[in-house]
Amino acid sequence: MKDQGVELIEGIDKLSIMGLSRVVGRLPYLLRLKRKIKILLDNRGIDLVIPIDFPGFNMSIIGLAHRRNVKVLYYVAPKVWAWGSSRIAKLMRCTDSLAVIFPFEEEFFRTRGCNARFVGHPLLDWIQPLSE
């Protein structure tokens, strides 16, 4: 995305956090990042927020964007089909569209009122040439 001219607030490399102990250890960083994003949303005239994966953090960011009437395209939507549907209402309310990476997710989200579109899985584009 950066190569296409999108301004990144933070790179995915710094947000790849798995496991409760790692999240707790990175909590001060995540809180500072959330404050930074809130300030940017308030002061920069941002047109679109594209959160990528990481629902533990990004679900709060989509709420911030929604309250400021900033459009949200959530790429790699939360796996509510696996972890429970409690996030669907917020996704419906706070996103303009979801870019989903598994074919079945498009129908799953659409039947629940979300504007979803299957865009393919980024790893499949990389793996397919290896198998040929």
How would you name each of these model-derived features?
Residues 1-131:
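Active-site and donor-binding regions of nucleotide-sugar-utilizing enzymes
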